[in-house]
Amino acid sequence: MATVSMPCTAVLIDLDGTLVDSAPDIVEAANRMLADFGSPALPFDTVAGFIGRGVPNLVRRVLETAGLTPRVEAAEAVAMFHRHYAETNGRLGSVFPGVEAGLEALRRQGYRLACVTNKPRALAVPLLALTGLSQYLEVLVAGDSIAQMKPDPEPLRHACNLLDVDTAQGVLVGDSAVDVAAARAAGIPVCLVRYGYAGPGGPAALGADALLDSLEALPALLTPARLAPAA
């Protein structure tokens, strides 16, 4: 794997599917929303496959799959989902194995750490607090922190700006095609975890610069030089 001499100083990390297995919380909230509309629950894997592009997209896909569009107003459904998700957020999911050890190792080695997620701040903040992961992170860029969300590169640039580092000195860790697209647009390397919500083809099909079995494996990949993004 190619490397360059500029050291990586910032590690930007996705939340859902990368740090936390939040699918149980999200699927439960989505199916509670469907129940409110008198619709049967969708399979777990179906709803989990919609995670990663923000709540409005997830709710839209759920409504379409359940055959509720255009009868149900999207805004009403999003509000209903948020109400249920506030109750399930951080209650059913769990931190992936190796995440805390990996974050601690990165912090100990001097890397600046930020979470960059499409999850709204009102949901991301309590989830990071409930899981204890907020103690490792200097910065949170949520889905509504700025006008753009991943796969737009601007959230990655914004995170680096808040960390006071050049974007070129960052590396993104995620689990989906959204993360790969954002990193490519920002011109930085991207590592994908082998678990998470990559979709039917799995993470190997998404063209990341490296695949991680665990976040604990990341420090070794960043030492002594940063990963170079694929051409």
Swiss-Prot record:
Q: Where are the transmembrane segments?
A: none
| Pathway(s) the chain acts in | Organic acid metabolism; glycolate biosynthesis; glycolate from 2-phosphoglycolate: step 1/1
- An example molecular function term from Gene Ontology annotations: metal ion binding
Q: Name one GO cellular component term.
A: cytosol
Which cysteines in this chain are paired by disulphide bridges?
none
Its keywords, alphabetically, are: Calvin cycle, Carbohydrate metabolism, Hydrolase, Magnesium, Metal-binding
The name this protein goes by in its record: Phosphoglycolate phosphatase, chromosomal
Q: Source species, please?
A: Cupriavidus necator (strain ATCC 17699 / DSM 428 / KCTC 22496 / NCIMB 10442 / H16 / Stanier 337) (Ralstonia eutropha)
* Gene this chain is encoded by: cbbZC
